[in-house]
Regions:
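N-terminal mitochondrial targeting presequence
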Residues: 1-66
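Cofactor-pocket helix-loop regions in the catalytic cores of large enzyme subunits
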Residues: 67-73, 333-356, 363, 552
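Beta-strand segments within the central parallel beta-sheet cores of soluble alpha/beta enzyme folds
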Residues: 113-118, 377-381
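Glycine-rich phosphate/diphosphate-binding loops that line cofactor/substrate pockets in enzymes
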Residues: 74-85, 176, 349-354
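Conserved phosphate- and dinucleotide-binding cores of soluble alpha/beta proteins
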Residues: 47-54, 64-71, 77, 92-108, ...
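N-terminal low-complexity or amphipathic/hydrophobic leaders
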Residues: 86-103, 343, 350, 355-386
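Nucleotide donor/acceptor-binding cores
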Residues: 84, 112-115, 140, 353-354, ...
Length: 555
């Protein structure tokens, strides 16, 4: 049988979906099959961003076989296009590709603009990092976890001058890892039952409406799809891919194999894998074979361009300790005495052999109150297991910092790793205890510690990840009992955006200790600080609580 020549040739019409209905008596001898019916329905095909001419990849072209080494960063970024998505590695200013960022800034907003940048944080309180590109107006959209001390960026967001998609640090890491591994999406416990899940964190703000003091919301946050597995709720996160990744490494050979120093690794490897083109600035460019196979942290297959690092490393927060025996412990202020009391009691939650994560602020003081026979492994979410004390002046290394961007040391047996590995430890419940600060704690164990709408917009950093598995990792809050304005931090119900729902097991303040019933909700007062009575705690607590029959003295 021969088919009619009049049948529509659809091979020359891209973007069509064809629906055919064919019924034919194939044994019939007539030239045209009487019962043959064919029709083509011309439908608008679903938009394919990979084929649509308006969405052709903005990534520079890769030329296989050519040298990966470029003379300088300006040459390497010359063909990056406006509208590109840039994945910028580093943590604070540690491991940030400052040489490449300065080259991008030199392109100017006339030549390079409308960039979307993905980073853990964008700049700092001192010049450096992506702050230069946000201030120049070349970046108009950010995906990050932490604004922190970047007051300029915080102000630009609150004034509606830049779009910011807040995303937990560990989720950004996993979204990048998924993007580089060809996985389109995944489910995570992080952020469930918070504004992150419901899309309640605005991406872009506008000026207040007439007669209102609150900003209008020009772009809402993305609502996450949820699903239950084994009786627990998870939210779906989509992978992140970029056009260009920029990172800094210690040694890079001419084939692109990279070796990083200590905590500079963080987002470098996972961003390089998630980008179409990866540009690395190298402190040392070495011949192929100079880096031992076991020392290659990122393989050359993921690196496309190599430039010499010419901008010196920047140190955000140099924190040191006095040499042994020379600490000045006299004349402590009342505030320091209160903080020490909290830290001393917090140290009792850290048992010998425990793996622990300590949030910034008061939690970091706890190890200094451990007894000599108690040894713990401190994990820092920027990629340390086995974090030590602050360094002496002679020990300061800008490539070894903690989650608060402060200089630290490493103890014998310590290891460093990238952010995907770090948050696998955290989300997977491999940490025994995690200690965090708080803005508010609810009587049911709810925790709020990252935002005061309209006033403070710091970002959640890694906090949402740290509290995402409270059944396996005990969550302890270490905080002063009241805020600076005298308002209660321990409340019946949190009014601030939640970091996690029903996650806190123990609350330690300068006045007392509460144990939290996460399942049924409710607080029990178990310890009182010296000189504090139950009535004082009641006056300064905006939540109902029971008093233990065997209440103890807080030591």
């Amino acid at each position: 049988m021969s088919l009619s020549r009049r049948i529509l040739n659809t091979t020359r019409l891209p973007g069509l979906r064809i629906t055919s209905s064919i019924r034919c008596q194939w044994g019939q001898k007539s030239r045209d099959c009487r019962h043959f019916q064919s029709y083509a329905r011309l439908l608008e095909a679903p938009r394919n961003p990979y084929k649509d001419e308006e969405n052709v990849s903005k990534a520079p072209k890769i030329v296989r076989g050519a040298s990966k080494v470029y003379k300088n960063a300006d040459e390497a970024v010359a063909d990056i296009k406006s509208g590109s998505t840039i994945l910028s590695a580093g943590f604070g200013l540690c491991g940030t590709a400052e040489t490449i960022i300065e080259a991008l800034e030199r392109r100017g907003p006339e030549s390079l603009h409308s960039l979307t940048a993905v980073s853990n944080n964008a700049g700092a309180s001192i010049p450096g990092g992506l702050g230069a590109l946000t201030q120049s107006g070349q970046v108009n959209r950010l995906i990050l976890s932490f604004i922190g001390s970047n007051k300029v960026l915080e102000k630009k967001y609150l004034e509606g001058k830049i779009a910011i998609e807040l995303c937990p640090q560990g989720t950004i890491a996993e979204r990048l890892r998924a993007g580089g591994a060809g996985i389109p999406a995944f489910y995570t416990p992080t952020g469930v039952s918070t504004l992150l899940q419901t899309g309640g964190i605005p991406t872009r703000l506008g000026p207040p409406a007439e007669g209102s003091k609150e900003n209008t919301v020009l772009e809402k946050g993305q609502v996450r799809e949820t699903r239950e597995f084994d009786g627990k709720t998870y939210s779906m996160e989509k992978a992140i891919k970029g056009d260009v990744a920029i990172l800094r490494a210690w040694k890079v050979d001419e084939a692109g194999n990279c070796q990083f120093r200590y905590t500079t690794r963080t987002f470098g490897p996972i961003m390089a894998k998630a980008a179409k083109v990866a540009i690395v600035e190298a402190e040392e460019i070495v011949p192929v074979g100079s880096i031992a196979p076991a020392d290659v942290h990122l393989q050359g297959i993921y690196i496309d361009r190599i430039v010499p690092a010419t901008v010196p490393k920047k140190l955000e927060l140099k924190k040191t300790r006095a040499p042994e025996g020379k600490e000045d412990t006299s004349n402590k202020s009342d505030a320091i005495i209160r903080r020490d009391r909290i830290a001393r009691r917090t140290a009792k939650e850290l048992k010998n052999g425990y793996y622990v994560n300590l949030g910034i602020g008061i939690p970091t003081l706890a190890p200094s109150f451990l007894s000599p026979e108690t040894k713990v492994w401190i994990q820092s979410e920027n990629g340390i297991l086995g974090m030590g004390a602050y360094p002496t002046e002679e020990e300061v290394d800008p490539d070894i910092i903690n989650a608060g961007k402060e200089t630290v040391t490493l103890i014998p047996g310590a290891s460093t790793f990238d952010s995907a590995e770090s948050f696998a430890m955290i989300r997977g419940g491999h940490i025994d205890v995690s200690v965090l600060g708080a803005l508010q704690v609810g009587a049911n164990g709810d925790l709020a510690n990252y935002m005061i709408p309209g006033k403070i917009f710091k970002g959640m950093g890694g906090a949402m990840d740290l509290v995402s598995n409270p059944d396996e990792t005990k969550i302890v809050v270490a905080t002063e009992h009241v805020a600076k304005d005298g308002s209660a931090k321990i409340v019946q119900d949190c009014s601030l955006p939640l970091t996690g729902a029903k996650v806190v097991s123990t609350i330690i303040t300068d006045l007392c200790v509460f144990e939290v019933d996460r399942i049924n909700g409710g607080l029990t007062l178990t310890e009182l600080a010296p000189g504090v009575d139950v009535e004082e705690v009641r006056q300064k607590t905006d939540a109902k609580f029971e008093v233990a029959s065997d209440i103890k003295s807080m030591e």
